[in-house]
Amino acid sequence: MRAPGERWRPAGAALWLLLLLLLLGATESVRRAQPLRRYTPDWPSLDSRPLPSWFDEAKFGVFIHWGVFSVPAWGSEWFWWNWQGEGRPQYQRFMRDNYPPGSSYADFGPQFTARFFHPEEWADLFQAAGAKYVVLTTKHHEGFTNWPSPVSWNWNSKDVGPHRDLVGELGTALRKRNIRYGLYHSLLEWFHPLYLLDKKNGFKTQYFVGAKTMPELYDLVNSYKPDLIWSDGEWECPDTYWNSTNFLSWLYNDSPVKDEVVVNDRWGQNCSCHHGGYYNCEDKFKPQSLPDHKWEMCTSIDKFSWGYRRDMAMSDVTEESEIISELVQTVSLGGNYLLNIGPTKDGLIVPIFQERLLALGKWLSINGEAIYASKPWRVQWEKNTTSVWYTSKGSAVYAIFLHWPENGVLNLESPITTSTTKIMMLRIQGDLKWSTDPDKGLLISLPQLPPSAVPAEFAWTIKLTGVK
């Protein structure tokens, strides 16, 4: 204590000030470690969480369907169900013609070798494709996990087949390149005994959820810290059976990825297009007008399968022009575009899939300014044609046209010019000449170029500033 009448010494004041600053700093650290608000395990609360901005800015991702279904590689990734769940004759005939009598689906497990899986090469390909995020199947409806799940004994990629942690290896390679990592996870497993027991009980019991689904989801989040969880396999049961809201409240409040993680909408019957971080609604969903909620179109280069299949015909492969058109339309309507490939059982991405990805990457390297981090404009497409789609970024408006007009003049009815209007074409030096017509609107003279000098194939971008 100070003696009576002793004055406060400056050194003591400095010490108290230092302690106060340390206390305030610690308080701020605690505050930052906590979410701005706590989300309760109900949809009104969970749906109120703002979507992390990175997802809307990303626009384009690559989807990967890879698992034991890549071994028979015939029909689709639903091979096991089509063969033994529904007993489709063509699948039974395929097994009789190609495999020994008495073969089981489990026999395919050791043949899922991934011997040529080089995650660095995959990551280089996805980066060259222009992908800002990648979503890998950690477990499809067959139940085989592509990581050493502690609750999937002898039916995971560490115990059987590759003897590798496929999820972990790809994540490491992607993050070296600043590509966001998403994990696809199927809630159900077609033939798991506990799931079949719960199904027999009318989903009044939750043996499977407690022993398998929830432990795996928590393990994936804590082990790999994903940027995105792409849930699937929800359709047979309500979200109350899956305990979805309890998991999501933990994910948003207390998980190691609570601030950045994004989820989709497949968390139970009737959740799709109604609840979740963003909406898939259904596979290959295409809205007819601008939705009021963030959404994603997931589609596949192989039109009839998500997994690799040996019976894919060339006519089954989506054309480059269609892929670019779908991307443009999706982004114009405020969505993200998730394009799927299916690697082989050996871990190879077949050349035709690589070619499609690289073609899209080349187009994005020229026109990406109009795609990444863009926002929908007040008009999404020209009503007199479906070949011109709009995006915007700041004060700039981008008109992406899918067909080069024969007369070399692009007609845009929607933009309103001003005294400060400037118009250019991405990757072409200088401003373009333009005029207005009271009946036709804005008329833009496109550059007269030899084919070798045209900056892109299949779609081109006009950048407009100073328009309304």
Curated annotation (Swiss-Prot):
Record PROSITE patterns: ALPHA_L_FUCOSIDASE
Keywords: Glycoprotein, Glycosidase, Hydrolase, Lipid metabolism, Lysosome, Phosphoprotein, Signal
Family (UniProt): Belongs to the glycosyl hydrolase 29 family.
Glycosylation sites: N243, N270, N384
Residues carrying Phosphothreonine: T172
An example molecular function term from Gene Ontology annotations: alpha-L-fucosidase activity
The protein's name: Tissue alpha-L-fucosidase
One GO term (biological process): lipid metabolic process
Protein's cellular compartments: Lysosome
Function of the protein: Alpha-L-fucosidase is responsible for hydrolyzing the alpha-1,6-linked fucose joined to the reducing-end N-acetylglucosamine of the carbohydrate moieties of glycoproteins.
Catalytic activity: an alpha-L-fucoside + H2O = L-fucose + an alcohol; a neolactoside IV(2)-alpha-Fuc-nLc4Cer(d18:1(4E)) + H2O = a neolactoside nLc4Cer(d18:1(4E)) + L-fucose; a neolactoside IV(2)-alpha-Fuc-nLc4Cer(d18:0) + H2O = a neolactoside nLc4Cer(d18:0) + L-fucose
Protein's organism: Macaca fascicularis
Alphabetized InterPro entries for the sequence: FUC_metazoa-typ (IPR016286), Fucosidase_C (IPR031919), Glyco_hydro_29 (IPR000933), Glyco_hydro_29_CS (IPR018526), Glyco_hydro_b (IPR013780), Glycoside_hydrolase_SF (IPR017853)
Matches recorded under Pfam families: Alpha_L_fucos (PF01120), Fucosidase_C (PF16757)
Secretion signal, residue range per the UniProt entry: 1-29
Encoding gene, per UniProt annotation: FUCA1
One term under GO cellular component: lysosome
May be important for catalysis, annotated site positions: C298
Enzyme Commission code: 3.2.1.51
Subunit annotation: Homotetramer.
